[in-house]
Amino acid sequence: VKLSASMGLEIPILGSDTLDSNMVLEAASGSDVKLYVSTFYQEGGSPEFDEGIKAWLNEDATAMTNNGGNDTIAAVTAMGYDAYYVALEALKAAGSTDPAAVKAALPGVTYTGVTGDIAFDDIGDAIRDTAYIKVADTANNAWALETMQKAG
C-alpha cells in the first residue's frame, strides 16, 4: 500500500478479508490510495461483541500491541471468535473429539454468530450469506462501510 501511494497509483486496490486489517489501514493512512476490501464483519455489527473485544484489548497491553496498537476490530478477530463456537458445535454434533467424527459432523452444523449465519456444504466448505465492502478512510485512519450484500 505504501509503495502504491509513493508511486502515485490512481486505480483502486481491491482485496479480500485478509486485507481487512488495522495494519493495512495504517499503511494507507494519510495517502490518496483507494483501498477496498470485501469482508465478513463490520465493526458495529454486534455491539456486545465489539464492546467485549475492545475492553479486552484496552485492558491487555500485549493484546493491544498485537492488534497494531489500537482497538480497531478486524474481520479475522470476529471470524476467529465465531470459528471457536462453530468448532464447539461440531464437537457436540460429533459426540466425540475424534477428528474424523468432527469432520463428518461439520456439514450438519449451523450457527448464527457475530459475523452472521454460518453453515457448511457436504465437503465442509463454509456457506456464508453476507459480505461487507469497506473502503479505507485514509484521512481518519478508519474503515468505512461502502455497502453490504446479502445472498438470497
How would you name each of these model-derived features?
Residues 2, 6, 86-89:
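Short helices/loops that flank or line small-molecule/ion binding pockets
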Residues 61-78, 84-142:
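Segments of small-molecule ligand-sensing domains
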